[in-house]
Amino acid sequence: QLCMTTARETLRAAASLSPKDICLYVGIPFCPTRCAYCSFVSQSVEKSMKLIPPFLEALEKEIAATAAQVNALGLRVVSVYMGGGTPTTLSAEQLDRLCSVLEDEFDLSAVREYTVEAGRPDTISAAKLRVLRAHGVDRVSVNPQTMSDRVLELIGRRHTAADIERALM
């Protein structure tokens, strides 16, 4: 049943897109710690905090170059997904700046869904959530991986199941 429902919804969503519609992915390759199972390019913030400012400067240039191509081709951004890593490892000020750059460079008026991953409770704060909301983010993806403290410890996460619950309340 779930498989058929998912297939129908996927087909319905695909039918609503035009060939000029695109989805924008912004990758932030930083996390509080590196999980034992992770295969993504990412850096532990503890070990690479000094890399964040130059990374964001380079990302702003890449956003501008990408937006120029998107605009030249007459493409329309219909969704934005900021993933990682853990984008909420950025400070509220850095998130605000990044979202502002996206707004300045891209026409986001047709965006149907704007998602930011916030997979770690130790990276979620009221200030960051206010910034995201102010920029039109309408979906925050929180993926604790597990609610087992033992497994969290084994995979290299520094938080507990109780921390996850507190962050979401």
Residue ranges and their predicted role:
Residues 27-42:
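Local cysteine-cluster metal-coordination motifs and their immediate loop/turn environment
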Residues 21-23, 35, 113:
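Structural motif
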Residues 42-169:
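Conserved non-cysteine loop/helix-boundary elements of the Radical SAM core domain that shape
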Residues 25-27, 83-84:
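Residues at the beta-strand->loop junction immediately N-terminal to the Walker
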Residues 1-24, 73:
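N-terminal [4Fe-4S]-dependent radical SAM core
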Residues 21-23, 30, 46-50:
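Hydrophobic secondary-structure block in the mid-to-C-terminal portion of proteins
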